[in-house]
């Protein structure tokens, strides 16, 4: 079984004492972010690790805190933000994009270490959050774009929500 260790203030945290509901809520919300922008969740998680918000030392995910990982993910996330605005970009609900969002949501939750010995619950919550974020995000964006008469301002607003939401969630874990 994968053992993910979390650190807070350079001391090993006993994350088994954290309320399971809180862990599942964070996992779900990270999934929602991945549903909005597939690469935003892992990118912000990598930056959180790199900035020392939590430590991945001694885990299978320690590579996520390296500068090269952060820069590559940032470059790819920026590309996703640009590509999302192009008229020929397929809907996020087509199978390849949908599956990617579920996988990146679950992966991001795994990196954060949803809970020791409760990783499966966190992964499931993250995957469900990604489904909700994908379908809900597409629905809300479509409705708001229809009301506004333009998609671009709503797409940019969605970018801001994804970036700030990910920063908020990851900084709290």
Regions found by a protein language model. Give the residues of each.
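Core segments of transmembrane alpha-helices
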Residues: 80, 100-109, 158-163
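Cytoplasmic-side transmembrane-helix entry/capping segments in multi-pass membrane proteins
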Residues: 92-103, 125, 151-156
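Interfacial loop-to-transmembrane junctions
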Residues: 142-158
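Helix-coil boundary and interhelical linker segments in multi-pass alpha-helical membrane proteins
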Residues: 14-25, 48-68, 108-123, 168-173
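C-terminal ends of transmembrane helices
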Residues: 78-91, 135-147
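Final/C-terminal transmembrane alpha-helix of multipass membrane proteins
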Residues: 156-172
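Alpha-helical transmembrane segments and their juxtamembrane interface "caps"
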Residues: 46-47, 51-55, 64-83, 96-101
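Mid-bilayer segments of alpha-helical transmembrane spans in multi-pass integral membrane proteins
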Residues: 106-114, 126-139
